Every structure is written in structure tokens, then in C-alpha cells.
Curated annotation (Swiss-Prot):
Protein name: tRNA-specific adenosine deaminase TAD2
Phylogenetic classification of the source organism: Eukaryota, Viridiplantae, Streptophyta, Embryophyta, Tracheophyta
Superkingdom: Eukaryota
Stretches of the chain forming a coiled coil according to its record: none
Compartment(s) of residence: Nucleus; Cytoplasm
Recorded family membership: Belongs to the cytidine and deoxycytidylate deaminase family. ADAT2 subfamily.
Organism: Arabidopsis thaliana
GO biological process: one example: tRNA wobble adenosine to inosine editing
Protein EC: 3.5.4.33
Quaternary assembly: Interacts with TAD3.
Domain (CMP/dCMP-type deaminase) ranges: 7-135
Single GO molecular function: tRNA-specific adenosine deaminase activity
Length: 182
């Protein structure tokens, strides 16, 4: 990766990590993301599965819905929305899960950069490689995907989350540890 691109990648991932920290503060799994168009952040998202009581409200889905809503409000047709997604780049703190990786493929996103791998549900190489696209993936398109950007920072947030416990986990669950907010 070129030096300027590397610096930009760290800046964009920093924005995604900020979203992940907001998720952590809200007692959500700390995943955050930002979508870019022409090098500008146009949407951001964080996990909201507990808050919404909806297991599909991952950071990527939150940001995708934000973009689709804005573009529909702007009067863009479905083909224009598809064209916009084909020019977008996503930075996300953790490898997209199978659901999100599939959605990104369906939307035809250009590129995805992520922090740490998702060894349980990863859809960009850890479990499945949905970013490669295939004839079997109906209407799915391939996209460039690269991981390992600020992975230690992303893993650190996960450690904080799992050390404090998840009060929204099904019972019985281990006790929640109260920690000071910083």
C-alpha cells in the first residue's frame, strides 16, 4: 500500500473505530464503519442490535440504510443508487459477517477495508469468501477486500466488551462488570 494511502486508511479506520467506541459505550458489540465516496465520508454506522432488539442491525446495515434513505430522498432511481454503491469504499473495524458481506456483494460495493478478522462469522475470507463473487451468488458482484488495518485497536475494543460482560446476552450469563467511562 502506498504511504499516502496507508495514512488515509488509518484516518478512515480511526473514524470507524470512533463508531465502534460509541457502540461499546452503548453496551453493543463494538463494531463501527464508514462509507466513502471520492475520499469523503458519506455515512457511518455502529452496531445497534441490542438497542433495536434486531439482530440484523450491524454497523454496515445501519450505514447502508442511511445511504439508501438519503439517496431515495434525493430522488435517485434504483440504477442510480446501484451506480453510487459501485463507487463506494467501506472501512469497518471487523471483517464483515456473512450477512453483511453478502449484502455488500449484492450492492456491488467497490472495496472493503477491515480491522480484525471475524473467525466465527467472517464473510470476506475467514469462513466464506463472498467478496470474490460467483455465479452461485445470485446477482452478487465481487469486491476488493483487505484486512488487518488497525486490527489491534479493534481487538482491544472487543476485549473490553467481553471483559465487561453483555447485560443483553441470554440468561444465564456471567455478571456484568461496571467500568469507569473514559
Amino acid at each position: 500500500m502506498e504511504e499516502d494511502h496507508c495514512e488515509d486508511s488509518h484516518n478512515y479506520m480511526g473514524f470507524a473505530l470512533h463508531q465502534a467506541k460509541l457502540a461499546l459505550e452503548a453496551l453493543e458489540v463494538p463494531v463501527g464503519c464508514v462509507f466513502l465516496e471520492d475520499g469523503k465520508v458519506i455515512a457511518s454506522g455502529r452496531n445497534r442490535t441490542n438497542e433495536t432488539r434486531n439482530a440484523t442491525r450491524h454497523a454496515e446495515m445501519e450505514a447502508i440504510d442511511q445511504l439508501v434513505g438519503q439517496w431515495q430522498k434525493d430522488g435517485l432511481s434504483p440504477s442510480q443508487v446501484a451506480e453510487k454503491f459501485s463507487k463506494c469504499v467501506l472501512y469497518v473495524t471487523c471483517e464483515p459477517c456473512i450477512m453483511c458481506a453478502s449484502a455488500l456483494s449484492f450492492l456491488g460495493i467497490k472495496e472493503v477495508y477491515y480491522g480484525c478478522p471475524n473467525d466465527k462469522f467472517g464473510g470476506c475470507g475467514s469462513i466464506l469468501s463472498l467478496h470474490l463473487g460467483s455465479e452461485e451468488a445470485q446477482r452478487g458482484k465481487g469486491y476488493k477486500c483487505r484486512g488487518g488495518i488497525m486490527a489491534e485497536e479493534a481487538v482491544s475494543l472487543f476485549k473490553c466488551f467481553y471483559e465487561q460482560g453483555n447485560p443483553n446476552a441470554p440468561k444465564p450469563h456471567r455478571p456484568v462488570v461496571q467500568r469507569e467511562r473514559t
